[in-house]
Amino acid sequence: MSELLLELFSEEMPAFMQKNAEEGYLNIFTKIFEENEIFAKVQVFVGPRRITLHATHLPKITLPKEEEIKGPSIEAPEAAINGFCKAHNVSKLELPTKLISNQLYYFFVKKTEEREIKEILPEIIIEAINKYSWAKSMFWGDYKIKWIRPLRNILCIFDGEILPMQFGHLTANNITYGHRLTDNKKLEVTDFEDYRNKLLENHVILERAKREAIIKTGLLELANSHELIIKEDNRLVEEVVGLSEFPVVLLGKIPQKFLELPKEVLISSMRTHQKYFCLFDKTGNFTPYFLFVSNGRFTNAELVIQGNEKVLSARLSDALYFCKQDIAKTLESRLGQLEAATFHAKLGNLREKIERITDICNYIAPNNKDLITAARLCKSDLVSEMVGEFPDLQGIMGYYYAKHEGLNAEIAAAIRDHYKPQGLSDNLPSGNAALLALADKLDSLVGLMIAGETPTGSGDPYALRRQALGIIRIILENKLELNFNDLINFSINLYKDSSDENKNLIISFFKERAKFYFKNDYDIALINAVLDLNLVDTNFKLDALKEFLIEDAGKQLLNAYKRASNIIGDQKITGLVDASLFSTQPEKELFEVIQKISPQIIDSIADKDYKKALNLLSSLLTPITSFFDNVLVNDSDPKIAQNRLSLLQNICELFDKVAKFNRL
């Protein structure tokens, strides 16, 4: 069996694209091989500057094969038959026919002769290279090919020999290159083992998994050796894996003068901008140390550490300057600047947005002065120098500036946390922060949908699905008893260009997101039976109904309801139940139970005690079973029949006060 080695050597590829490229090229090569009936073992390795394919168990030749291609019916128009013949360069007389479903069809038998695999591999390779779609790609120089970064070399070896192929301006060879620390030393290789070994000798670890393991082990060992804690950060690990061909973990220190900065500023500078790992003491407190991954083992590691500390110091010096500039102004004084900051082209500026948020907060919690103050100031930090440089610190810098001004802790916390939750795993805000977060998200959701930014199957650029889920989680976690229909109406009316169509669209969207949220824990039929725009109420009902229907009594009662509902069908039942028309004991007993439990069920619903309401409904099981077993609803006397239908209607209406049982 034969072996193929391919390397696409380029300038540095973005780290966040490498893992997808590894999976993508593996799938593409595997699929194309299978389509050509080449069943090989395929591996793909991706690093900062190279994508490598290693395929083994390749046959020397491909077997001859025949493929039947179905053509038109023999009764098809002559033009269609001639077109099929022309496409396959044959005459009609040369085409065999086959009977399919009592109809004769022409067929063309495509024969493929056996070929040496090295003849078709260049075609396969070029097809695979072109088939992978990068999120972004580029042209360079005067060349016609397009790729993620400029390609500099193609190595392609089949069974120890260069496989003749060309991609754009590049002709395949047997050369690869070592790490930049080795001055990109040219390495001539013969096969995969030789290739991997020579790369390792020249400070390139081919396997992504090995680089990741080295980084994780190095981070943990170095942190432990200094009795420090490193928090798990798989996303950052994945990124630095894509930045280093030969990773070495080193320890640096933050200069003392920068420790007066908020820890979030330090963390953002290190993690987001420098790709450094923050360290904490055993009690979880932030420490002035960090770990970073060097791309290569340098003879003077201390010089590398000093260089990284110097780069970090430059960035933190800027942050310190920005912070001092910002605190010279109050959050209130920045409100005028928000008029120049656009929220959305169709929805005005951020000053207008905070006015709407303030109105919504006042609607939700009238006379809550701290909430209103937080609402007015919650976006002021967006026009600060710090947030301009570190956008991920929005809200956080507002919190520190509010504290610096002497505003109380409740206001500062609300400003900080009103962007939460930013995803399903994020913590939820509480207190005034929860109300402010709700108001902000609701205004964004309503406004952007009015502006025509409703999410589609192909995109949700403003993350409105996430915003809606955030609203739902805030309401449920904080048990906010809100009439969401009224709240949406209020929010919509804050916009001039609103309509009933907008309202219906927003409510429908919100209900769908609520269904999406609840279906993790409840059957969709249960959700449809109880969902309304009071989500706390909906949650109580779901819990009660789920527990109720697990029991046999609940299942039997549901069946009884369905039987009653089916008997009524589409009939419009009018009129009250007349007890004087009862002629059997079961219908008398059933009516007595209904009269007894009806006010109790209404009281239980008012108290939101849905378990009690369902238990009261359970007391109908015996009399309703007796009724169905012993009473003929469609009596020969129309008055009696109508009265019994009214009795069943009473039962269904009583059930429907708790939930829409017809949806179960």
From Swiss-Prot:
One GO MF term attached to the UniProt entry: ATP binding
Enzyme Commission identifier(s): 6.1.1.14
Subcellular location: Cytoplasm
Record's catalysed reaction(s): tRNA(Gly) + glycine + ATP = glycyl-tRNA(Gly) + AMP + diphosphate
Keywords assigned by UniProt, alphabetized: Aminoacyl-tRNA synthetase, ATP-binding, Cytoplasm, Ligase, Nucleotide-binding, Protein biosynthesis
Keyword ATP-binding among record annotations: yes
Chief site of localization: cytoplasm
GO biological process: arginyl-tRNA aminoacylation; glycyl-tRNA aminoacylation
One GO CC term on file: cytosol
Record has Coiled coil as a keyword: no
Class of this enzyme: ligase
NCBIfam families named among the record's database cross-references: glyS
Family under the similarity heading: Belongs to the class-II aminoacyl-tRNA synthetase family.
Quaternary structure, from the entry: Tetramer of two alpha and two beta subunits.
Protein name, entry field: Glycine--tRNA ligase beta subunit
